[in-house]
């Protein structure tokens, strides 16, 4: 019995390297190096197809049916109606999308039905529009995330575009839990400097860099330049991720007929995921949105030995080192049991 337990735990520990749900995202090995390893030493890296401008219940269901496993939602605080709305262009009194509550409840219901909803990326358009005690405050939207999304196991990414000095950013920064992360937009050196200067206490695995352009081919480059070009900046961000200075790196926005750029982003820049969809339109079912999703999904399928589409089993903000130490403590526990000792961890990882 003890021997079988020991073997089982050893196999579980090996999953930190071999199994998708436990695999470190990219801690030191590039795909071209991993290919040289025997299969039992390889790990596969999870990839995220992030649907762009999902602001309606219908958009959520369409994106899920297209294979999206993560979702970018534009969020506007409505100081007149005292709430948050999914809306790209913030204008009080005009609601382009559904309420945040309705959006969140739909995501939670879809996840409960077994659909893949790994994380929801909130892109705040006017994060400081309301003060603390209003229903449209940053505190209110964070609590709504925790009450609805996170209770169903859905992770949250708070996105701040040129809002690092906002009260909202500071509030989120000071109140992150392990199901949440922060994304900052910009070139690699800028993002790293911002995290180290304005959010030094935010764990590295909860630091996300995003970079791109509405017109992705504009200034894209070939991934080998010194700086500035989209692909190069993202590749340098992935280098920081491998060094443990960032948790994830995401690109935006791929659209129809941009499979070549998707190939560069995933294959050369080694990003963790790509926002895809329409350039300037909210998400809905269309041949172009389906094609943009398929560019990412088919790329991963063709390289399934090294990559896979992230599932609900993945925690994108996981601290892999903490997990490894927890498994190691259980391994030690089994050894102590074999010597008639009893010292096993009581808390979860």
UniProtKB/Swiss-Prot annotation:
Its cofactor is Mg(2+). Binds 1 Mg(2+) ion per subunit. GO terms for molecular function: metal ion binding; sphingomyelin phosphodiesterase D activity. It is found in: Secreted. Catalyzes the hydrolysis of sphingomyelin. Sphingomyelinases D are produced by some spider in their venoms, but also by arthropods such as ticks, or pathogenic bacteria and fungi. They might play a role in pathogenicity through different mechanisms, such as membrane destabilization and host cell penetration, but also pulmonary inflammation and cutaneous lesions. Belongs to the sphingomyelinase D/phospholipase D family. This is Sphingomyelinase D. It comes from Uncinocarpus reesii (strain UAMH 1704).
